[in-house]
């Protein structure tokens, strides 16, 4: 007789993904400038550590908030007791106003429609429980965040059907890709309950444009399904074009009095924009009262501590601080992004043009020994074990094209990033002859075929020639 549940013993958590395996290898041999200078540098973790000094400065200037005081009087006992799981009103108001500020105050949010969760991971899973039954499917554009295989599927039993996007158009979402994914789900006898997108994208570091957002809204309207817009990177946009929230497009296109209004749900957190993943601050925003009610009840399994809510309600209510923080943080992200792009370019490596996020989508297709995912994994292993950099292979993000990698840049010092760039440049230079020989061999084979072809091509009809190509 089995003593453990099927959920406890199943292998569907996704922990065997190369995304998580890279973390494990880093933890075995972490880089340290003094203690372990040849260790693995963590470039597979999307953390924003660039503006901690701004947060620390605010805390030093506001000892009451950090010391759980109000007007000099301790409120420790008040915060230590059970709180309403709807969340502290002061924090929810501060959170919705901060969300508006991140979006340039072009849209406003009602705190009554906000559900607090212990991070965006909890928010996304809670929405799955609210919107899908076991075996139902959500469509996700590829490449997507590897953790979604765990967050959306493991405990809920929901399925993910990929919307295959291509580098030919910068991995943009197209109508044909949406329809193909929908039909694929139907062929697999899966009931499609919605589409989930990250905007800005993880791992691409790009923002969805208005055309894509309008396309998504039209699609979910026609199919009668939901849209989840994960906007946890909305405050990390450091270059044009600017960030456009799906809420803006809903209002611009007058969806307020349609069924679509209640079928669009936003996920947000302070992990990326404010660099506080350890504080576990996430949120669901929905115009559907039933979703808000159900998600609020479920949030009792992953509450945000009252102490954290009080501290951050004070911080986010300081508009002078939030304005300075948003601006300065974006400047620092822009500088660090440019440093990574320049370093990779000096090594002969290009990136997808991006304007947001804490990472770049890096093109290493020319370094593959062959054009397949086995070669991608071989290259990834060399970069992790030989070069000493933990980066995320595109296959872990369900990219359909081998040779792409996500590389993070905001979770380390400039000196560490500079060292990482020197390591990758040395690696490319040491392997360049092999890569060149591989390319030359391919070209030689192609030329040989062309010469052979020319000897008897006159015998073929035009149609035969077309088929040969």
Curated annotation (Swiss-Prot):
The Low complexity compositionally biased stretches are 437-447
Keyword hit for Lyase: yes
As given in the record, the signal peptide range reads none
Question: Where N6-(pyridoxal phosphate)lysine occurs along the chain?
Answer: 272
> Per UniProt, which keywords does this protein have?
Ethylene biosynthesis, Fruit ripening, Lyase, Pyridoxal phosphate, S-adenosyl-L-methionine
Give a short account of what the protein does. Answer: Catalyzes the formation of 1-aminocyclopropane-1-carboxylate, a direct precursor of ethylene in higher plants.
* The protein's name in its UniProt record: 1-aminocyclopropane-1-carboxylate synthase 3
Native species: Solanum lycopersicum (Tomato)
């Amino acid at each position: 007789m089995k003593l453990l549940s099927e959920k406890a013993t199943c292998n569907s958590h996704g922990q065997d993904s190369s995304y998580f395996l890279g973390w494990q290898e880093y933890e075995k041999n972490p880089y340290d400038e003094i203690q372990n200078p040849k260790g693995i540098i963590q470039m597979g973790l999307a953390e924003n550590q660039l503006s901690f000094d701004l947060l620390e400065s605010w805390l030093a200037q506001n000892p009451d908030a950090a010391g759980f005081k109000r007007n000099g009087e301790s409120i420790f006992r008040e915060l230590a007791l059970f709180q309403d799981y709807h969340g502290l009103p002061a924090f929810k108001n501060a959170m919705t106003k901060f969300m508006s500020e991140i979006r340039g105050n072009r849209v406003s949010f009602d705190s009554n429609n906000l559900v607090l969760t212990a991070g965006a991971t909890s928010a996304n899973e809670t929405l799955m429980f609210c919107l899908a039954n076991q075996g139902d499917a959500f469509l996700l554009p590829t490449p997507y965040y590897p953790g979604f295989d765990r967050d959306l599927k493991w405990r809920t039993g929901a399925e993910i059907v990929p919307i295959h996007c291509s580098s030919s158009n910068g991995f943009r979402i197209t109508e044909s890709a949406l329809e193909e994914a929908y039909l694929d789900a139907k062929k697999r006898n899966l009931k499609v309950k919605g589409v989930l997108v990250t905007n800005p994208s993880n791992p691409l570091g790009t923002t969805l444009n208005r055309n894509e957002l309008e396309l998504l809204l039209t699609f979910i309207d026609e199919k009668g399904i939901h849209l989840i817009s994960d906007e946890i990177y909305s405050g990390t946009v450091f270059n044009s074009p600017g960030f456009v929230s799906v809420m803006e497009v809903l209002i611009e296109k007058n969806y307020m009095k349609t069924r679509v209004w209640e079928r669009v749900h936003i996920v947000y957190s302070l992990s990326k924009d404010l660099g506080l993943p350890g504080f576990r601050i996430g949120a669901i925003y929905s115009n559907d009262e039933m979703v808000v009610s159900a998600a609020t009840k479920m949030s009792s399994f992953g509450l945000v501590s009252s102490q954290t809510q009080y501290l951050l309600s004070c911080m986010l209510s300081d508009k002078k601080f939030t304005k300075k923080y948003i601006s300065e943080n974006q400047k620092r992200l822009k500088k660090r992004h440019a440093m990574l792009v320049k370093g990779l370019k000096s090594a002969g490596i290009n990136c997808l043009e991006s304007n947001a996020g804490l990472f770049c989508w890096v093109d290493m297709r020319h370094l593959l020994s062959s054009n397949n995912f086995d070669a991608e994994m071989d290259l990834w292993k060399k970069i992790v074990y030989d070069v000493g950099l933990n980066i995320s292979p595109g296959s872990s993000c369900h990219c359909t094209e081998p040779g792409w990698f996500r590389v993070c840049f905001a979770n380390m010092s400039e000196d560490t990033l500079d060292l990482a760039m020197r390591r990758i440049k040395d690696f490319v230079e040491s392997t360049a002859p092999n890569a060149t020989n591989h390319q030359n061999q391919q070209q030689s084979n192609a030329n040989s075929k062309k010469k052979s072809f020319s000897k008897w091509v006159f015998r073929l009809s035009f149609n035969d020639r077309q088929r040969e190509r």
